[in-house]
């Protein structure tokens, strides 16, 4: 029986199902894996028995992924499962930042006791005249799960859509509308845009990527939208641009001491993925990833280990080795197997950055001494006997 510890409220209705062969436990010390959402695990003392962590959501900033990699713990996330929810909210922000909807509604509430409100509302509406999205130029930074959907939706709205993503995958390139005009540099994307929306992860090369230089390239009174990660935007630069009128509006999903005091903003409570459908989709994907890893050793959508799959574990034995990406690891592994006269049916090795993953099937179960010898290889983080 495999044991799962859940952290956070995974779904709105509380239903989380792994199926036969799994049970939920009350403490992480009892668990084989953790299913979580947004709790910050930095500083968390992870029990040695934890083999994997799956986050129900994109990203992994709340998890010390490299630290866990060195402990042989695979961290999964669920990219794309909440992408439609984020896309819809971004589209809503495009409308709200262009039509004075909230300001108009506030006027109505503030004047609810006015006996002549019908007449006065007609007079007041000219203060909330906005602009249409059709024909306006929008730049989309990042054409992944969310960005590609936003770009395609903006095409459907009749906008002039430009996209920037030097690392776009083949999968997302195929689904991107031919009407989206891809550009080669961030500067070319920003130049003359009426709207700019950001959809990239937080990494060393994306932190602060939207600052004064990029804002100055936008069209006058442009709108900036950030429903990606808080750190992508230089808050001081955005604050100054709003106060100077270079930006007419800023919408983001991250309430910080700085953003909440900026003028002309819509700040939401990290609600981009806040739908029941998105929560369920994320949970389903995370559960599927955990089960495939625990049962078969396969890795998909990990943020600290490479993707790797050998299908279902059908041989007599399957072993997975999590180790540093250094020379001669395969040689050392196969030498130990040869010493035990183990016949390897299939073997695969993948690497990502500093970490690597080796998995193999054998005709017979390996001796405990062979498993122990594998564990003693320098730079070996963990050896799993899957079957």
Regions found by a protein language model. Name each.
Residues 42-44, 167-259, 274:
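Rossmann-like adenosine-cofactor binding region
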Residues 216, 220-313, 322-324, 357, ...:
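Rossmann-like dinucleotide-binding domain for NAD(H)/NADP(H)
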Residues 79-137, 298-303:
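Phosphate-binding beta-alpha-beta segment of Rossmann-like dinucleotide-binding domains, i.e.
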Residues 1-79, 211-213, 217, 234, ...:
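An N-terminal-biased, well-structured beta-alpha scaffold segment characteristic
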Residues 146:
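Hydrophobic/small residue at the entry helix of a nucleotide-binding pocket
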Residues 304-387:
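A conserved regulatory-domain signal marking ACT and ACT-like small-molecule sensing domains
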Residues 87-106, 155-159, 284-298, 334-338, ...:
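Oxidoreductase and adenylate-handling cofactor-binding alpha/beta cores
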């Amino acid at each position: 029986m495999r044991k799962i510890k859940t952290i956070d409220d995974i779904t709105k209705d509380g239903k989380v199902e792994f199926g036969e062969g799994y049970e939920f436990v009350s403490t992480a010390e009892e668990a084989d894996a953790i299913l979580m959402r947004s709790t910050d695990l930095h500083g968390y003392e992870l029990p040695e028995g934890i083999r994997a962590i799956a986050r129900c959501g994109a990203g992994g900033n709340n998890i010390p992924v490299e630290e866990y990699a060195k402990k042989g713990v695979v961290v999964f996330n669920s990219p794309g499962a909440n992408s439609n929810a984020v896309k819809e909210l971004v589209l809503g922000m495009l409308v709200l930042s262009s039509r004075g909807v909230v300001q108009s509604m506030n006027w109505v509430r503030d004047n609810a006791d006015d006996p002549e409100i019908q007449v006065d509302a007609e007079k007041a509406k000219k203060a909330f005249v906005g602009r249409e999205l059709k024909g306006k130029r929008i730049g989309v930074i990042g054409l992944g799960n969310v960005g590609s959907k936003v770009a395609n939706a903006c095409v459907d709205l009749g906008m002039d859509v430009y996209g920037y993503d030097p690392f776009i995958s083949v999968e997302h390139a195929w689904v991107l509308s031919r009407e989206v005009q891809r550009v080669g540099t961030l500067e070319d994307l920003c130049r003359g845009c009426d709207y700019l929306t950001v959809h990239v992860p937080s990494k060393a090369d994306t932190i602060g990527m939207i600052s004064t230089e990029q804002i100055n390239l936008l069209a006058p009174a442009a709108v900036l939208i950030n429903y990606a990660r808080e750190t992508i935007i230089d808050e001081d630069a955005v604050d100054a641009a709003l106060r100077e009128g270079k930006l007419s509006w800023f919408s983001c999903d991250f309430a910080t001491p700085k953003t909440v005091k900026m003028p002309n903003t819509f700040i939401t409570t990290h609600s981009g993925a806040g739908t029941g459908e998105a929560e369920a989709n994320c949970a389903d994907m995370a559960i599927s990833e955990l089960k495939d890893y625990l049962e078969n050793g396969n890795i998909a959508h990990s943020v600290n280990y490479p993707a790797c799959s050998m299908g279902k574990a059908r041989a007599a034995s399957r072993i997975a080795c999590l180790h540093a990406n250094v020379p001669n690891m395969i040689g050392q592994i196969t030498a130990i197997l040869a010493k035990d006269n183990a016949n390897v049916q299939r073997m695969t090795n993948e690497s990502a950055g500093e970490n690597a993953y080796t998995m193999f099937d054998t005709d017979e179960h390996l001796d405990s001494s062979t498993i122990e010898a594998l564990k003693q290889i320098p730079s070996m983080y963990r050896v799993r006997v899957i079957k």
